[in-house]
């Protein structure tokens, strides 16, 4: 499947298929040099997939740490200095091969190297179906995730579904959170459909039918980011579950998607409190348990610690914390939420696990 962005200009293709990696060679021929920034774990398992590409004299491989460990100033400077030592030009390309963190990092390198060079995303996880599309790139600060970054469109996104076959279950769980988030944004019918399809751990682990839901998730995100590239309006909806989720991820060091799922439940609790919504919290908790999400850490959540992180969320303004909330399916809002409501929601969340 080939999708295409529909901006007024500077559009890019998104290839979503088994064997999509074959498209890379077509692009490499257009660049004077290419630097493949590859996650150390992906390199360990899939190095042979890139042998043909690396046979090109003008292609270099740079192995970087896996996950969020790579999104540091130190790694950023080290990588830039190495690339600059090869006398690059603006017709150089940075190719990100790995999960969402790899794409974030490599994209920020591409955006800032010579004020912008070509950038190709080659996501290898389910989670990265979300982050590889839309142009958000960046690194982390000691103050929180993704606070230093840019909006930078890739030249192409090449999503080879063959990479998913070897994902450990923890990464399947983490990635599924973003797939599920897109279903929630699409409404009650889409949510019921995906819950009925992936109804337990066994089916989720098999990845049966995942291709369809990944493609639908990408289409959902494209519709939103083309309408609001710089996150001034509806693109904020894509942060569903992330205000609280990022805080949980940062302080409890759990996978991104696991934390987002906790954040999704949390926002349902907040929506019930603010709007008298009738979301069935037990339903969502039981669904996550059926899928195998480890939720024991919820009893250890410390609101004061998490709140300090939430205050740094990029959606906030001078009035305080803003959250994306599902008031009702099909009625999504970005809402200021006061500290007391946030605290009560955290306390209520914990009561479900006592």
UniProtKB/Swiss-Prot annotation:
GO terms for cellular component: cytoplasm. Gene3D superfamilies: 3.40.50.1970, Dehydroquinate synthase-like - alpha domain. GO terms for molecular function: 3-dehydroquinate synthase activity; metal ion binding; nucleotide binding. Its cofactor is NAD(+); Co(2+); Zn(2+). NAD(+) binds at residues 39, 45, 68-71, 100-104, 124-125, 136, 145, 163-166. Pathway: Metabolic intermediate biosynthesis; chorismate biosynthesis; chorismate from D-erythrose 4-phosphate and phosphoenolpyruvate: step 2/7. The keyword Zinc applies. Catalyzes the conversion of 3-deoxy-D-arabino-heptulosonate 7-phosphate (DAHP) to dehydroquinate (DHQ). Belongs to the sugar phosphate cyclases superfamily. Dehydroquinate synthase family. This is 3-dehydroquinate synthase. It comes from Staphylococcus aureus (strain MRSA252). The gene is aroB.
